[in-house]
């Protein structure tokens, strides 16, 4: 008797599935702006929306936004809950598909992008490095003229006003981005509640991320006179002051969007 082949179990656990239209718009726009050239260079750029949740909105929107910079991009939504995959199937079309799976990333290609938003919040901090390594190992490798695929892992509030994410390449973590709707912000440290799992428990004295948010609040307070020109101008002035002491990697074009990106090494946990 021939043994019946078994399908490996997906790696990971079911998330709450909370999602909303446009929840991940800030992350999508950042990806399109900073990773668009890599996507255009790829022969078959596949992006994975990992853990898209109870409805397929974020995968649908990711495809639309990526195609503004890479018209041949494709998106595969991956969910560990079979019922969510079945519910998303009617939304499939050219360039958009849905698959049952988890951190193993059940696509034949090495993806140019893996987006994992609000997935790791339910995991222990000690599990993050292993998940990152597994996902980075699935990315398209670096090559001549290419830095390889990109993993974007982070957390946001329910309607996407406040978001913090880590960007990683095949080699590991690169940067941390803080993004917000500026009108919703009282002070930059309000973003602390949306730190990704690798950092949220490190927002304590003695840790780099705590020092960064402390300095950001001080720069924000010092920039108070710019508030008369609007929250955007105040944010931009505060970020400009931050660059004196912190390795900010972006510039005014991204700051105007309510963003600031810092090298991972500057914020990485100690010990």
Label each region the model flagged.
Residues 1-45, 49, 54-56:
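Class I SAM-dependent methyltransferase Rossmann-like catalytic core
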Residues 45, 111-112, 149:
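Conserved acidic residues
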Residues 48, 53-106:
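Class I SAM-dependent methyltransferase SAM/SAH-binding core
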Residues 111-129:
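A short SAM/SAH-binding and catalytic strip from SAM-dependent methyltransferases
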Residues 121, 129-148:
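A short glycine-rich, Lys/Arg-flanked "PGG" loop and its adjoining helix->strand segment in the class I
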Residues 164-234:
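A conserved mid-domain beta-alpha-beta active-site/ligand-binding segment of alpha/beta enzyme cores
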Residues 210-271:
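Conserved Class I S-adenosyl-L-methionine
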């Amino acid at each position: 008797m021939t043994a019946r082949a078994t399908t490996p179990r997906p790696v990971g656990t079911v998330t709450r599935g909370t999602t909303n239209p446009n929840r991940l718009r800030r992350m999508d726009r950042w990806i399109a702006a900073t990773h668009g050239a890599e996507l255009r260079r790829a022969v078959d750029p596949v992006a994975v929306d990992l853990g898209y949740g109870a409805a397929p909105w974020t995968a649908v929107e990711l495809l639309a936004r990526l195609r503004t910079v890479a018209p041949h991009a494709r998106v595969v939504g991956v969910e560990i809950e079979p019922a969510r995959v079945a519910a998303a199937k009617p939304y499939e079309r050219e360039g958009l598909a849905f698959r049952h799976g988890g951190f193993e990333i059940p696509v034949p290609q090495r993806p140019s992008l893996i987006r994992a938003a609000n997935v790791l919040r339910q995991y222990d901090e000690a599990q993050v490095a292993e998940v990152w390594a597994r996902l980075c190992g699935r990315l398209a490798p670096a090559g001549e003229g290419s830095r390889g695929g990109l993993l974007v892992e982070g957390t946001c509030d329910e309607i996407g006003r406040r978001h913090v994410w880590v960007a990683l390449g095949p080699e590991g973590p690169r940067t941390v981005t803080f993004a917000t709707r500026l009108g919703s912000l009282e002070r930059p440290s309000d973003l602390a509640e949306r730190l990704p799992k690798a950092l949220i428990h490190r927002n304590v004295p003695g840790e780099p991320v705590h020092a960064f948010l402390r300095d950001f609040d001080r720069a924000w307070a010092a920039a108070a006179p710019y508030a008369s020109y609007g929250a955007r101008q105040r944010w931009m002035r505060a970020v400009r002051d931050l660059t004196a002491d912190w390795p900010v990697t972006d510039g005014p074009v991204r700051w105007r969007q309510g963003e600031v990106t810092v090298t991972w090494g500057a914020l990485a946990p100690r010990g």
